[in-house]
Amino acid sequence: AIAFGGAVISGNTRITGTSVLWGEVYATDNVWIDNSEISQGAYISDSVTIHDSLVYGQCRIFGHALIDQHSMIVAAQGLTPDHQLLLQIYDRARVSASRIVHQAQIYGDAVVRYAFIEHRAEVFDFASIEGNEENNVWLCDCAKVYGHAQVKAGIEEDAIPTIHYSSQVAEYAIVEGNCVLKHHVLVGGNAVVRGGPILLDEHVVIQGESRITGAVIIENHVELTDHAVVEAFDGDTVHVRGPKVINGEERITRTPLAGLL
């Protein structure tokens, strides 16, 4: 292990393996850094563990956070309207085999595996982001995943969930496979969205016990709740345009005529 260029190491910090610390970094308290490179202003404290990973830039990693499996944490300000916000990973958050960049926030008991999380996106509470070696989950802009929500990639080609803009996945919702959430989308309750490809855009709320599967486009002020189902079969694409509320036991398996207008 080697430290230089203004690195400060204090407290009971352990630096092991082939670790390199340089460029005004600060490691203190009970931090353990193993086979990792930490540089350019990172501040790491409390009981953080970092294995086999890279941390670069002005960020704060604290609490009992764990970063491992060749994760890359690359902090950068100035790419969003909030110039002051620092990238932070804290509480009991765990980040594995992922890239966390810009000003993203990972905290609570969140678990992030095989993901690319950028801009000011947030994962917190007991949320789970679960990609795989083939497909990384992608969160960007001001997307949020929280509560007990799960966002999961599939193993097929393009089975990549992408959460954009101010979209949110919350409560006990599950979003899986080739799903794109764009402007003002909330998936909550016990809803299941399983693509795909699925596109949700422009003020779409999916909640209750509702379910969306197959090739589905839902856009423009649509609410799906209760036990409602939108399901596409055999290469068909179901397209639902609002304003519309789909509730009760309603089931849509083909494009409503009004949806074509």
Spans of features found by a protein language model:
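Glycine-rich hexapeptide-repeat left-handed beta-helix
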Residues: 11-261
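LRR N-terminal entry segment and analogous cap-like coil->beta motifs
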Residues: 2-8
